[in-house]
Each structure stands twice: as C-alpha cells, then as structure tokens.
C-alpha cells in the first residue's frame, strides 16, 4: 500500500500533495487536506480521490498562469476556515501546536479538572518526559498562544498545571514502559546525560535497543541539574524524573568525559547520539577584564559551581551583567549565598529584557533592582 503521501497527526490522517515549483508562491509550500479518519485503508481510498481533484485544479491553475503571463488568479485549494464551527477548535489547538513537544494540553487539563492527576501526568510524560521539571522551569511557549488571552488578561496556567499533575499524582512506577526481555542486539551510545540523551534513551529502550549513557559529571540531568537553582527546581523532583528513565534499564557510565570522538567511534556501538548541549557562557571583554579576574564569574559556570557546592559564599556586593534567565538565576542565587547588595545591569530597556516575565517578577519580588539602559565600559576591580 502506498502511504508515501500520508501522515498521521493526533489520530487523523492527512494527505500531502506535491505542488509545482512555479505555483508554490500562490498555493503555499505545504498543500494538504485532512482526511478525518483513523483507518489507514480508508485514508488511502480518500487520498486517491483527493489527489485526482487536486490534479485537475493544479492543471487549471497552470493554464491560467500561462495564458495570463503568470498574473492570473489561482483558485483557492483549501476551503476557508469556518471558525463558527465548534469542531474547528477541537482540531486546531493553538497552545498544543505552540508547544515544541505538542503536548495535548486540553486532554491533560481536562483530567486535572476531574481530579485524575495520575492520568494527567502520564499524558504529559508521553510527550515531554519531564512534567514535574517543566512544570517549574518551562519557558511556556504555549501560554502566549492560549485563546483565553483573546477575552481575558492572562492565559490558562498551562505550565503550572503540569506541576499540579506531577505533585498530586500517585506512584507511576507500574505505568511506565519496561524494556523488553530480549533486545534487538543493537547498541547505542549516548554522550551527555542531559534531557536530550535521556529522552532518546526512553524512546529506544522500549524498542529493544541497548543504550549506554556517558556523562562527565557524577549524576545525570545535564544543565537541568547544574544550571537551574534548587530553589526553582528541587533536587528530589529532578532525581525522581531522571531516575524513571535510568531505571528502565539504561546503562550508565558517570565521571566519563569523552575527549576524542574519533577514538570513541571505534567502540562497539551501532550508533552514537551526541547530546552534550552547548554549556558555554558569554564573557565580556572590556577594559579591566583581566585585572578583575578574581572577582568575575561567568553566569552558567557560576551556577554550576553552586550546584556542585564549589561555591558556598560570595561577597556582600554583587553586580549581575545581563538581562536573560541566567542573569535572574544568578542574582537570586547571590542573595542566598549571603550577598546584601545585589543589582542587575542590562543594556536594553526594561521592556526588551530577554528573561521570562515571571523570572523578572521573581527577582523584583526579592527587592533586586534592575538598572536598564546601562552599558558596561570598564571593570574597576
């Protein structure tokens, strides 16, 4: 059966139709139509009919363009969206498409409203692996897309509801998938113990792959462990969700830094996944930088040192340069290390700060002043 031009999304088959290059501007690059069926055989039959109809329209449109030197009107291929039809809002869920993992938001919120927290958690877990972690730290791309903002000041608290499901769920150990008794004989190496490698492990282990994780630090978690302060992400929450994957049968080699990929590829693995992230902070090379080396910390290195307890105190006066989420974590961490006078200095206007709105609010609630439109010129000490 030819399924080349069929794809399935959220239990509905769609048909994709190739568009001639000279018509793409008028018709769009991805021309497709929903077949509204869950059955593959039925989808194939409907596809044939849809393709024939689209072919005739494409030929007519090409003829129209040719006869009018490329300026002819092109017939609309897709029907105009009927937003008065309630079914439209069940098929096109803005927040769900805004989520990089396409988490079925309405489904798990409905479960929470019914008090079914475990079910809500598992719906999340299938999509995003770390509901308890994301419920505390996600950047929330879903919430600006929430339709509630069209009629109310604020969106539904989609992110925090993940945390609700995670905090009130029952023990889900027996609900998590298990590795099959027999593997398929394929060995996969995962370099880096952060969320990317852990997600790959979760998906591959249940398919019978033998996965081995290599991590330079003594624990898995990656930047979730080293760069998110514990007052935002409690260690027990992080450990619980990371352990769910480790306990699926993932082999681990901690304190194992891979320094030569060339040599590593000689190992007995069928495939290698590199999930090392990009843990490199930004320096500020202005006058006096070298002379002030002893008193300067790079943002993510500073947070990592705190996480591993290499730093347990700091001076009384702290200036944080930058207006992103890392800067907000650094200034709040400084207060907890004993600093008495903490300021944040940003180049941009306050309204253009890169940090998430709630991160800025949390810092300001702790009485940390943010000085906008200040450009550092020189380090004095």
Where are these regions (language model features)?
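Short, Arg/Lys-rich segments that mark the N-terminal edge of DNA/RNA- and chromatin-recognition modules
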Residues: 1-37, 62-74
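Ferredoxin-type iron-sulfur electron-transfer modules and their immediate structural context
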Residues: 74-187, 235, 265, 274-293, ...
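Feature captures the FAD/FMN-dependent oxidoreductase FAD-binding
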Residues: 182, 187-191, 239-286, 378-381
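Rossmann-like dinucleotide-binding cores of NAD(P)H-dependent redox enzymes
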Residues: 210-213, 217-248, 252-253, 304-306, ...
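Redox-cofactor binding/interface segments in oxidoreductases and associated redox assembly factors
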Residues: 272-275, 298, 320
């Amino acid at each position: 059966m030819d399924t080349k031009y069929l794809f399935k999304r959220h239990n509905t088959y769609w048909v994709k139709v190739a568009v001639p290059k000279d018509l793409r501007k008028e018709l769009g690059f991805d021309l497709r139509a929903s077949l509204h069926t869950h059955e593959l055989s039925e989808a194939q039959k409907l596809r044939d009919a849809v393709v024939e109809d689209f072919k005739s329209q494409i030929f007519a449109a090409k003829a129209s363009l040719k006869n009018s030197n490329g300026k002819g009107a092109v017939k609309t291929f897709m029907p105009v969206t009927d937003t008065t039809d309630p079914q439209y809002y069940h098929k096109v869920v803005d927040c769900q498409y805004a989520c990089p993992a396409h988490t079925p938001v309405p489904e798990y919120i409905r479960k929470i409203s019914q008090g079914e927290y475990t079910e809500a958690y598992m719906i999340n877990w299938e999509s995003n692996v770390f509901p308890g972690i994301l419920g505390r730290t996600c950047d929330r791309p879903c919430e600006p897309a929430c339709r509630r903002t069209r009629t109310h000041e604020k969106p539904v608290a989609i992110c925090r509801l993940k945390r609700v499901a995670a905090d009130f769920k029952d023990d889900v150990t027996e609900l998590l998938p298990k590795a099959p008794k027999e593997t398929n004989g394929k060995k996969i190496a995962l370099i880096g113990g952060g969320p990317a490698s852990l997600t790959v492990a979760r998906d591959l282990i249940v398919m019978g792959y033998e996965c081995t994780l290599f991590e330079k630090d003594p624990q898995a978690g990656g930047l979730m462990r080293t760069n998110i302060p514990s007052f935002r992400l409690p260690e027990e929450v992080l450990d619980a969700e990371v352990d769910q994957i480790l306990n699926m049968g993932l082999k681990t080699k901690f304190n194992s830094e891979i320094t030569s990929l060339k040599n590593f590829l000689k190992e007995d693995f069928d495939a290698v996944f590199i999930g090392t992230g990009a843990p490199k902070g930004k320096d500020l090379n202005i006058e006096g930088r070298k002379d002030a080396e002893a008193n300067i910390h790079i943002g993510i290195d500073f947070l990592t040192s705190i996480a591993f307890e290499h730093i347990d105190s700091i001076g009384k006066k702290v200036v944080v340069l930058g207006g992103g989420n890392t800067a907000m974590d650094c200034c709040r961490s400084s207060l907890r290390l004993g600093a008495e006078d903490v300021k944040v200095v940003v180049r941009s206007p306050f309204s253009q700060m890169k940090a998430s709105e709630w991160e800025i609010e949390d810092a300001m609630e702790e009485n940390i002043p943010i000085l906008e439109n200040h450009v550092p010129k020189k380090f004095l000490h």
